[in-house]
Amino acid sequence: MKVLQMFFCVILLCVTSVLVEAKSTTKGDETASKRNFAQFAAMTYHTTHRWPKKYVGYGCYCGLGGYGIPVDPIDECCKTHDACYKKVEDSGICSYSWAIYLTIYKRKGGAECSEDNEKCQMEVCKCDSVAAKCLGKYKDIFNEKYAGYDKKGKCDPSFTLS
């Protein structure tokens, strides 16, 4: 049942974020995925035991785009994740700017990155791992009032991520 729930969740996340065809293959205890987003969803589910879709649109930073002041520590985790991706993108270690969203990296299961990753893969995996662990740390303070949050109306756009 959990496998079916996770598969359904990954499909919903991919549709929500306009990323299509989230397929996974498993080799030993390392997982490679066709889309980085599906891997982050798997890490998040592992650390929070919550459907990752619940975090899409949470607060001012969780999901696509983010600005303003984080509403709580969970939203701060998402802001940090956005900043981590931006740092990797700005560093130029990945071959093109959208690589951070499409990079296939290897995990040791859970929210741990495999040592058998190229530099771009490893940095993207680290961003996802740190964020998933952060979300797991604060899983008990998840507040439904911040799910589906009105970013345009409630997040202060003068505090954009730069």
UniProtKB/Swiss-Prot annotation:
The keyword Ligase belongs to this UniProt entry's keyword annotation: no
Q: Which residues form the active site?
A: 81, 128
The signal sequence is: 1-22
**EC numbers:** 3.1.1.4
Q: Where in the cell is it found?
A: Secreted; Nematocyst
- Known catalysed reaction(s)? a 1,2-diacyl-sn-glycero-3-phosphocholine + H2O = a 1-acyl-sn-glycero-3-phosphocholine + a fatty acid + H(+)
- Give the cofactors, semicolon-separated: Ca(2+)
Matching InterPro entries: PLipase_A2, PLipase_A2_dom, PLipase_A2_dom_sf, PLipase_A2_His_AS
Which residues does Ca(2+) bind? 61, 63, 65, 82
Question: Pfam families per the record?
Answer: Phospholip_A2_1
Which keywords, in A-to-Z order, does the entry hold? Calcium, Cleavage on pair of basic residues, Disulfide bond, Hydrolase, Lipid degradation, Lipid metabolism, Metal-binding, Nematocyst, Secreted, Signal
* Gene3D superfamilies reported in the protein's UniProt record: Phospholipase A2 domain
- Predominant cellular place of this UniProt entry's protein: secreted
Tell me the enzyme class.
hydrolase
Q: What does this protein do?
A: PLA2 catalyzes the calcium-dependent hydrolysis of the 2-acyl groups in 3-sn-phosphoglycerides.
This chain belongs to the protein called Phospholipase A2
